Design a protein with these regions (language model features):
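Short, contiguous pre-domain boundary segments
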Residues: 5-9
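C-terminal substrate-binding/active-site "lid" region of AdoMet-derived donor-dependent transferases
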Residues: 196
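A polyanion-binding, active-site-adjacent surface
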Residues: 2, 14-162, 166-169, 174, ...
Length: 224
Protein backbone atom coordinates (compact mmCIF):
# COMPACT_ATOMS: atom_id res chain seq x y z
CA UNK A 1 0.00 0.00 0.00
CA UNK A 2 1.43 3.36 -0.97
CA UNK A 3 2.20 5.89 1.74
CA UNK A 4 1.43 9.57 2.05
CA UNK A 5 4.52 11.73 1.63
CA UNK A 6 5.56 15.37 1.60
CA UNK A 7 3.72 18.08 3.50
CA UNK A 8 0.57 15.99 3.81
CA UNK A 9 2.57 13.45 5.82
CA UNK A 10 3.62 16.14 8.28
CA UNK A 11 0.06 17.48 8.53
CA UNK A 12 -1.57 14.09 9.05
CA UNK A 13 1.15 12.23 10.96
CA UNK A 14 -0.91 12.28 14.14
CA UNK A 15 -3.57 10.16 12.47
CA UNK A 16 -1.18 7.30 11.75
CA UNK A 17 -0.68 6.73 15.49
CA UNK A 18 -4.39 6.60 16.32
CA UNK A 19 -6.00 3.24 17.17
CA UNK A 20 -8.61 3.67 14.43
CA UNK A 21 -5.89 4.00 11.78
CA UNK A 22 -4.10 0.84 12.90
CA UNK A 23 -7.40 -1.01 12.57
CA UNK A 24 -8.14 0.65 9.21
CA UNK A 25 -4.69 -0.22 7.86
CA UNK A 26 -5.03 -3.86 8.89
CA UNK A 27 -8.51 -4.10 7.36
CA UNK A 28 -7.44 -2.52 4.07
CA UNK A 29 -4.31 -4.66 3.79
CA UNK A 30 -6.37 -7.81 4.35
CA UNK A 31 -8.92 -6.68 1.78
CA UNK A 32 -6.21 -6.08 -0.84
CA UNK A 33 -4.71 -9.50 -0.14
CA UNK A 34 -7.98 -11.43 -0.27
CA UNK A 35 -10.31 -9.53 -2.60
CA UNK A 36 -10.32 -7.32 -5.67
CA UNK A 37 -10.11 -3.76 -4.38
CA UNK A 38 -10.11 -0.43 -6.21
CA UNK A 39 -8.14 1.68 -6.76
CA UNK A 40 -4.92 -0.33 -7.15
CA UNK A 41 -2.94 -0.08 -3.91
CA UNK A 42 -0.24 2.09 -5.49
CA UNK A 43 -2.90 4.67 -6.45
CA UNK A 44 -4.59 4.81 -3.06
CA UNK A 45 -3.24 8.20 -1.96
CA UNK A 46 -2.92 9.81 -5.40
CA UNK A 47 -5.07 12.79 -4.39
CA UNK A 48 -2.43 13.68 -1.80
CA UNK A 49 0.52 12.85 -4.09
CA UNK A 50 -0.72 14.93 -7.03
CA UNK A 51 -1.82 17.93 -4.94
CA UNK A 52 0.53 18.85 -2.08
CA UNK A 53 -1.13 20.64 0.83
CA UNK A 54 0.69 23.91 0.19
CA UNK A 55 -0.61 23.94 -3.40
CA UNK A 56 -4.30 23.27 -2.69
CA UNK A 57 -6.56 26.01 -4.08
CA UNK A 58 -9.76 24.04 -4.64
CA UNK A 59 -11.25 20.96 -2.97
CA UNK A 60 -13.77 18.71 -4.73
CA UNK A 61 -15.15 15.93 -2.56
CA UNK A 62 -16.41 12.61 -3.81
CA UNK A 63 -17.80 9.65 -1.88
CA UNK A 64 -16.11 6.33 -2.62
CA UNK A 65 -14.06 5.26 -5.66
CA UNK A 66 -15.52 3.93 -8.89
CA UNK A 67 -15.99 0.19 -8.43
CA UNK A 68 -15.71 -1.19 -11.97
CA UNK A 69 -12.55 -2.49 -13.63
CA UNK A 70 -9.93 0.03 -14.70
CA UNK A 71 -11.74 3.15 -13.54
CA UNK A 72 -10.50 4.31 -10.15
CA UNK A 73 -7.00 5.70 -9.73
CA UNK A 74 -7.21 7.71 -6.53
CA UNK A 75 -8.76 10.98 -7.74
CA UNK A 76 -12.48 11.51 -7.23
CA UNK A 77 -14.59 11.69 -10.41
CA UNK A 78 -11.49 10.90 -12.54
CA UNK A 79 -10.92 7.71 -14.54
CA UNK A 80 -7.83 6.35 -16.22
CA UNK A 81 -7.05 7.13 -19.83
CA UNK A 82 -8.88 4.89 -22.28
CA UNK A 83 -11.82 4.30 -19.94
CA UNK A 84 -15.29 5.57 -20.85
CA UNK A 85 -16.16 8.83 -19.10
CA UNK A 86 -18.64 8.04 -16.28
CA UNK A 87 -22.06 9.75 -16.26
CA UNK A 88 -21.35 12.16 -13.39
CA UNK A 89 -18.18 13.37 -15.10
CA UNK A 90 -20.08 13.73 -18.39
CA UNK A 91 -22.37 16.13 -16.53
CA UNK A 92 -19.42 17.98 -14.99
CA UNK A 93 -18.02 18.47 -18.49
CA UNK A 94 -21.42 19.71 -19.69
CA UNK A 95 -21.53 22.32 -16.93
CA UNK A 96 -17.94 23.32 -17.73
CA UNK A 97 -18.94 23.76 -21.37
CA UNK A 98 -21.94 25.89 -20.45
CA UNK A 99 -20.12 27.87 -17.74
CA UNK A 100 -16.64 28.38 -19.16
CA UNK A 101 -16.85 27.38 -22.82
CA UNK A 102 -14.65 24.30 -22.43
CA UNK A 103 -15.03 21.69 -25.14
CA UNK A 104 -16.10 18.24 -23.95
CA UNK A 105 -13.00 15.99 -24.09
CA UNK A 106 -12.75 12.36 -25.11
CA UNK A 107 -11.41 11.17 -21.74
CA UNK A 108 -12.04 11.47 -18.02
CA UNK A 109 -8.47 11.77 -16.76
CA UNK A 110 -8.35 14.76 -14.38
CA UNK A 111 -4.67 14.81 -13.42
CA UNK A 112 -4.38 18.26 -15.03
CA UNK A 113 -6.74 19.66 -12.41
CA UNK A 114 -4.89 17.95 -9.55
CA UNK A 115 -1.54 19.32 -10.74
CA UNK A 116 -3.00 22.87 -10.62
CA UNK A 117 -4.09 22.61 -7.00
CA UNK A 118 -7.51 20.96 -7.24
CA UNK A 119 -7.63 18.31 -4.51
CA UNK A 120 -9.88 15.51 -5.79
CA UNK A 121 -10.66 13.77 -2.52
CA UNK A 122 -13.00 10.86 -1.95
CA UNK A 123 -14.18 10.62 1.65
CA UNK A 124 -13.72 6.82 1.46
CA UNK A 125 -10.53 5.83 -0.35
CA UNK A 126 -11.16 2.17 -1.24
CA UNK A 127 -14.00 -0.06 -2.45
CA UNK A 128 -14.54 -3.72 -3.26
CA UNK A 129 -14.94 -4.46 -6.96
CA UNK A 130 -18.53 -4.01 -8.10
CA UNK A 131 -19.80 -3.24 -4.57
CA UNK A 132 -20.49 0.47 -4.13
CA UNK A 133 -19.96 1.80 -0.59
CA UNK A 134 -18.55 -1.56 0.56
CA UNK A 135 -15.79 0.17 2.57
CA UNK A 136 -18.01 2.79 4.14
CA UNK A 137 -17.53 2.86 7.90
CA UNK A 138 -14.19 1.04 8.14
CA UNK A 139 -12.32 4.21 9.17
CA UNK A 140 -11.58 6.21 6.04
CA UNK A 141 -14.14 8.86 6.96
CA UNK A 142 -12.22 9.70 10.13
CA UNK A 143 -8.98 9.96 8.18
CA UNK A 144 -10.37 12.17 5.40
CA UNK A 145 -12.19 14.31 7.98
CA UNK A 146 -8.76 14.97 9.49
CA UNK A 147 -7.54 16.10 6.06
CA UNK A 148 -10.56 18.39 5.72
CA UNK A 149 -9.81 19.89 9.14
CA UNK A 150 -6.21 20.53 8.07
CA UNK A 151 -7.49 22.28 4.95
CA UNK A 152 -9.94 24.38 6.95
CA UNK A 153 -7.08 25.56 9.17
CA UNK A 154 -4.95 26.80 6.27
CA UNK A 155 -4.34 30.53 6.53
CA UNK A 156 -5.09 31.23 2.87
CA UNK A 157 -8.16 31.19 0.62
CA UNK A 158 -9.39 27.78 -0.58
CA UNK A 159 -12.57 26.99 -2.52
CA UNK A 160 -14.63 23.99 -1.38
CA UNK A 161 -17.05 22.58 -3.95
CA UNK A 162 -19.66 20.52 -2.11
CA UNK A 163 -21.80 18.53 -4.53
CA UNK A 164 -24.57 16.41 -3.06
CA UNK A 165 -25.67 15.78 0.50
CA UNK A 166 -22.73 13.62 1.68
CA UNK A 167 -20.24 16.33 0.67
CA UNK A 168 -22.44 19.06 2.13
CA UNK A 169 -22.41 17.27 5.48
CA UNK A 170 -18.77 18.36 5.74
CA UNK A 171 -19.78 22.03 5.70
CA UNK A 172 -19.99 22.12 9.49
CA UNK A 173 -16.23 21.48 9.59
CA UNK A 174 -15.50 24.52 7.41
CA UNK A 175 -15.59 27.68 9.52
CA UNK A 176 -12.56 29.61 8.24
CA UNK A 177 -13.83 32.92 6.81
CA UNK A 178 -10.97 32.99 4.28
CA UNK A 179 -12.50 30.08 2.37
CA UNK A 180 -15.31 30.03 -0.19
CA UNK A 181 -17.90 27.25 0.09
CA UNK A 182 -20.07 26.52 -2.95
CA UNK A 183 -22.88 23.98 -2.78
CA UNK A 184 -24.92 22.25 -5.49
CA UNK A 185 -26.71 18.96 -6.09
CA UNK A 186 -24.52 16.03 -7.12
CA UNK A 187 -23.67 15.85 -10.86
CA UNK A 188 -25.12 12.34 -11.04
CA UNK A 189 -27.81 11.91 -13.73
CA UNK A 190 -30.24 11.40 -10.84
CA UNK A 191 -29.75 14.92 -9.48
CA UNK A 192 -27.83 17.13 -11.93
CA UNK A 193 -31.02 18.73 -13.23
CA UNK A 194 -31.97 19.85 -9.73
CA UNK A 195 -29.38 22.60 -9.76
CA UNK A 196 -25.95 21.26 -10.63
CA UNK A 197 -26.49 22.39 -14.20
CA UNK A 198 -26.31 26.16 -14.07
CA UNK A 199 -24.44 26.37 -10.75
CA UNK A 200 -21.47 28.06 -12.45
CA UNK A 201 -19.10 26.78 -9.78
CA UNK A 202 -16.12 26.71 -12.12
CA UNK A 203 -16.30 30.37 -13.11
CA UNK A 204 -17.17 31.39 -9.53
CA UNK A 205 -14.11 29.50 -8.31
CA UNK A 206 -11.84 31.33 -10.73
CA UNK A 207 -13.37 34.72 -9.91
CA UNK A 208 -12.62 34.08 -6.23
CA UNK A 209 -9.07 32.90 -6.91
CA UNK A 210 -8.28 35.91 -9.10
CA UNK A 211 -9.82 38.29 -6.54
CA UNK A 212 -7.40 36.82 -4.00
CA UNK A 213 -4.36 37.21 -6.24
CA UNK A 214 -4.17 33.54 -7.24
CA UNK A 215 -3.87 31.94 -10.66
CA UNK A 216 -7.22 30.69 -11.96
CA UNK A 217 -7.67 27.01 -12.79
CA UNK A 218 -7.47 26.00 -16.44
CA UNK A 219 -10.43 23.62 -16.35
CA UNK A 220 -10.05 22.41 -19.94
CA UNK A 221 -9.16 18.71 -20.06
CA UNK A 222 -7.61 18.10 -23.47
CA UNK A 223 -8.42 15.31 -25.88
CA UNK A 224 -5.93 12.46 -26.03
Amino acid sequence: MSAISGDWLEALKGEFHQPYYAKLYKTVMTEYQTRKIFPPADDLFNAFHFTPLNEVKVVIMGQDPYHNDGQAHGLCFSVKRGVETPPSLVNIYQELHDDCGCYIPNNGYLEKWAKQGVLLLNTVLTVRAHQANSHRGIGWEQFTDAAIQVLNEQDRPIVFLLWGRPAQMKKSMLNNPKHLILEAPHPSPLSAYRGFFGCKHFSKTNEFLVANGLEPIDWQIENI
